[in-house]
């Protein structure tokens, strides 16, 4: 579909908008005027005419698709394989559990601290499993979001969030 843009005076633009609305009877068009601007909208296009002191400006608005094509994308009618559902359920049950890391890890992106080392004696809480997002299975490198609270000298308690693999932590008593 090709769309052209024409530059015209504000009076001509308003009369052309009403003529376009009358000429295309099969496409419902709506014309509204508010605060020195006229808007012509249809199911196929949306044009906004703005009047200024020197000239009229014609802007083309894009429409957003509300439904995806049924031949592509995620089909909600088909069910996922049972082993994926069991794995998802098993991983979602871990959310809220207290965990410890198995070996020391360095965390670099902590505000106002150069680096923090997580040791096996520190306890964190799993906040989220990110392997299932917006109805689709994804394969993140570090699927578990774990929150730690550490005491830093001269700053008090600092909350930091770390993404970990399942092999990097062990679950302790809930």
Swiss-Prot record:
Compositionally biased tracts (Low complexity): 69-81
A GO BP entry: photosynthesis
InterPro entries named among the record's database cross-references: Elect_transpt_acc-like_dom_sf (IPR008990), Fd_thioredoxin_Rdtase_alpha (IPR004207), FTRV (IPR044166)
Keywords for the protein's UniProt record, in alphabetical order: Chloroplast, Oxidoreductase, Phosphoprotein, Plastid, Transit peptide
GO CC terms, sorted: chloroplast
Molecular function as annotated in GO: oxidoreductase activity
Transit peptide stretch: 1-62
Subcellular location as annotated: Plastid, Chloroplast
Gene3D superfamilies: 2.30.30.50
Coiled coil: none
UniProt key word Transit peptide: yes
Chain positions covered by the region annotation Disordered: 69-89
Keyword Transit peptide: yes
Entry-annotated residues carrying Phosphoserine: 70-71
Similarity remark: Belongs to the ferredoxin thioredoxin reductase alpha subunit family.
PANTHER family per record: FERREDOXIN-THIOREDOXIN REDUCTASE SUBUNIT A1, CHLOROPLASTIC, FERREDOXIN-THIOREDOXIN REDUCTASE, VARIABLE CHAIN
Function recorded in the entry: Variable subunit of the ferredoxin-thioredoxin reductase (FTR), which catalyzes the two-electron reduction of thioredoxins by the electrons provided by reduced ferredoxin.
Subunit description: Heterodimer of subunit A (variable subunit) and subunit B (catalytic subunit). Heterodimeric FTR forms a complex with ferredoxin and thioredoxin.
Name of the protein in its database record: Ferredoxin-thioredoxin reductase, variable chain, chloroplastic
